[in-house]
From Swiss-Prot:
Domain of life: Eukaryota
Organism: Arabidopsis thaliana
PANTHER family: F-BOX DOMAIN-CONTAINING PROTEIN (PTHR24414:SF99), F-BOX/KELCH-REPEAT PROTEIN SKIP4 (PTHR24414)
Keyword set, alphabetical order: Kelch repeat
Protein name: Putative F-box/kelch-repeat protein At4g02310
Placement of Kelch repeats on the sequence: 154-204
CDD domains: F-box_AtAFR-like (cd22152)
InterPro entries on file: F-box-like_dom_sf, F-box/kelch-repeat_ARATH, F-box_dom, Kelch-typ_b-propeller
Residue ranges of every copy of the F-box domain listed in the record: 11-58
Length: 349
């Protein structure tokens, strides 16, 4: 085969109009986007464009789910209730998802699947398309109150202690699940001890390290290569505990300040300007959704769940502004013994 023939498919693809290319890219799973960005400058531009996010939104490629934990006097009677967000009606609809029996501490989504880890020496995987639950390969050790992160087709589970004895299980601080080989192995031990963790995110623009929010209110940066940990000083003592990444920028909500973003070069938190709903909310949950920031809160007085969809714009090198695209009540008459358990985004239907 001649060189011209080998290059023909790539050349023909580059000649297609951008609107056709966008429709093709919108149907490609998001975890392939970093690879596509390396093909050409035009593809790199289109993969990160707002037009692609809008196209994916119209195709309903991303969906978000909310799980509530129904508390009872007996731990064995604790139940979980799942709801799916319906965008055209802007409401939460109850769905018959099956949850693991154990109160799993951490979740991680990979495409349409939700992984549950922590609390016991097991891992469960929920397929959001079928609602079916299956058990995955057993972790090396159990871990209570641990954090998870996904980097390069590997799930990192780290931190967490034996809640009874207040020590790390068998001296293992971190364990890694290889999605390709479906096997677990010991990961780089953390250079500091992190007992209680409650949120983690990964951002490719910052060296594919894992950022973890702990109960000490600090954010710890875990380096997957050697286990080295650095700390980010919190902007305020009253944060929501939840954080997310939108376009490779980390966001966190602070009750006394508002929504903030992390400026990695200066190593400081800055306020997202232009938002008027800053205040004290109960049970905050935030996540990236179609390139926007979905901001959920629980109004306990009215027993309602509300959501604001926020557009973020500006430069992470200068300033970032936010604009509320819409704010709407998603659920009413929520029982008083229901609490937020999981808020997760599944992609690529």
């Amino acid at each position: 085969m001649s060189t011209t023939a080998k290059e023909a498919p790539s050349s023909l693809f580059s000649l297609l109009p951008n609107d056709i290319v966008l429709n093709i890219l919108a149907r490609v799973p998001r975890w392939y986007h970093p690879i596509l960005s390396c093909v050409s400058k035009n593809l790199r531009f289109l993969v990160s464009s707002s037009e692609l996010k809008i196209t994916r939104s119209l195709l309903e490629k991303d969906r978000f789910y909310v799980c509530f934990q129904e508390h009872s006097n007996s731990p064995s009677l604790t139940t979980y209730h799942w709801f799916s967000f319906t965008e055209n009606r802007r409401c939460l609809v109850s769905i018959p998802f099956t949850s693991p029996v154990e109160p799993y501490f951490a979740t991680l989504t990979l495409g349409p699947e939700i992984y549950f880890v922590g609390k016991s020496r097991s891992m469960w995987i929920l397929d959001s398309r079928s609602g079916k639950l299956r058990q995955g390969p057993r972790p090396l050790v159990a871990c209570d109150q641990a954090a998870v992160g996904l980097v390069n087709d590997k799930i990192y589970v780290f931190g967490g202690i034996d809640d009874m004895n207040k020590r790390y299980y068998e001296g293992i601080h971190a364990q890694v699940f290889d999605l390709k080989t479906q096997t677990w192995h010991v990961g780089p031990n953390l250079s500091v001890k992190l007992a209680c963790l409650n949120r983690s995110v990964v951002t490719p623009s910052l060296g594919r390290k894992i950022y973890v929010r702990g109960t000490d209110r600090d954010v710890t940066i875990y380096d997957i290569k050697d286990g080295k940990c650095d700390k980010i000083i919190p902007a305020d003592d009253f944060s929501s505990g939840d954080m997310c990444v939108v376009d490779n920028v980390i966001y966190m909500y602070y009750h006394n300040v508002g929504l903030m973003w992390y400026e990695s070069k200066e190593k400081q938190w800055s306020v997202v300007h232009g938002l008027e709903f800053n205040g004290v909310f109960n049970s905050i949950a935030i996540a990236e959704y179609n390139g926007k920031l979905a901001f959920l809160w629980h109004d306990r007085n009215k027993r309602e769940i509300w959501c604001a969809m926020i557009n973020l714009y500006g430069s992470s090198k200068v300033a970032i502004r936010g604009r509320v695209e819409w704010s709407h009540r998603l659920l009413s008459d929520l029982p008083s013994n229901y609490n937020f358990k999981h808020f997760t985004i599944c992609t690529d239907y």
